[in-house]
Curated annotation (Swiss-Prot):
Transmembrane segments: none
PTM notes: N-terminally acetylated by acetyltransferase NatA.
Primary location class: cytoplasm
Note, other: Present with 65600 molecules/cell in log phase SD medium.
SUPFAM superfamilies: Translation proteins (SSF50447)
Coiled-coil ranges (or none): none
Gene name for this UniProt entry: RPL33B
Protein name: Large ribosomal subunit protein eL33B
Modified residues (N-acetylalanine): 2
InterPro entries xref list: Ribosomal_eL33, Ribosomal_eL33_CS, Ribosomal_eL33_sf, Transl_B-barrel_sf
GO biological processes: cytoplasmic translation; ribosomal large subunit biogenesis
Organism phylogeny: Eukaryota, Fungi, Dikarya, Ascomycota, Saccharomycotina
């Protein structure tokens, strides 16, 4: 049997980028599993992110849909990254799982 290869790591959508009083929904903060420092997070810059969810209406034979984004830069000292999505993630996804794909590769 063929060996399976891991194509993505899991992450959590924490929040939007924000200041004391203002939210910026264009930028989402993502916590990647197993990443604890900005140096470790550097590896994921430019990687593609997918938020996979199920909808009630079937489109083209599937109820599963995806919102795509990209890791843009690190955020803070705890290994959190900033990401932009083609369409902003809705606020109901705070705490939801996202997939950070290991491509495009820069190794």
């Amino acid at each position: 049997m063929a060996e399976s290869h891991r194509l993505y790591v899991k992450g959590k959508h924490l929040s939007y980028q924000r200041s004391k009083r203002v939210n910026n929904p264009n930028v989402s903060l993502i916590k990647i599993e197993g990443v604890a420092t900005p140096q470790e997070a550097q590896f994921y810059l430019g990687k593609r992110i997918a938020y996979v969810y199920r909808a009630s209406k079937e489109v083209r034979g599937s109820k599963i849909r995806v919102m795509w984004g990209k890791v843009t830069r690190t955020h803070g000292n705890s290994g959190v990254v900033r990401a932009t999505f083609r369409n902003n993630l809705p606020a109901k996804t705070f705490g939801a799982s996202v997939r950070i794909f290991l491509y495009p590769s820069n190794i």
